[in-house]
């Protein structure tokens, strides 16, 4: 993998785990797009532009205050594309525990992420304890 992309994606994932929106947004291109894991459209829900992307990212922590992305692996797909896999783990606002494998597809604009397209297994909440 391109060392720069690898460095960016590792730092990006760490910023997600740190719930550090400012660091995350510093890695996003000015013209950025985020496609959520679910939504009414074929691509999920599209959030276009820094303000909308930021708000959508922050909603992840609002909905899952202890959200974590574990066991990250990173892949260079060639050109301006890359991919990461991780295991999402978090507790929703009703106390439901969630854990599922996920994939993020990225498009880079230079050294910034211009597109984050998220996919996660559709798994019901699991029992706690």
Q: Which residues make up each language-model segment?
A:
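Preference for short coil/turn "hinge" residues that link or interrupt alpha-helices
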Residues: 18-21, 40, 106, 112
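Short, low-complexity N-terminal intrinsically disordered segments enriched in polar/charged residues
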Residues: 1-30
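Generic alpha-helical hydrophobic packing signal
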Residues: 8-15, 50, 54, 81-83
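A beta-strand edge to alpha-helix "cap/lid" segment located at domain peripheries
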Residues: 1-4, 54-129
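A solvent-exposed, acidic/Ser-Thr-rich amphipathic alpha-helical stretch
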Residues: 23-78
């Amino acid at each position: 993998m391109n060392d720069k992309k690898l460095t960016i994606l590792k730092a990006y994932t760490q910023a997600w785990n740190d719930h550090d929106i400012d660091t995350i947004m510093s890695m996003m291109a000015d013209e950025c797009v985020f496609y959520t894991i679910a939504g009414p459209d074929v691509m999920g829900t599209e959030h276009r532009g820094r303000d909308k992307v930021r708000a959508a990212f922050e909603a992840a922590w609002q909905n899952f205050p202890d959200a974590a992305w574990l066991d990250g692996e990173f892949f260079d797909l060639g050109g301006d594309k890359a991919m990461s896999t991780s295991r999402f783990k978090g507790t929703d606002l009703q106390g439901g525990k969630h854990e599922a494998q996920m994939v993020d597809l990225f498009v880079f604009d230079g050294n910034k992420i211009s597109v984050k397209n998220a996919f996660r297994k559709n798994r019901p909440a699991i029992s706690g304890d």
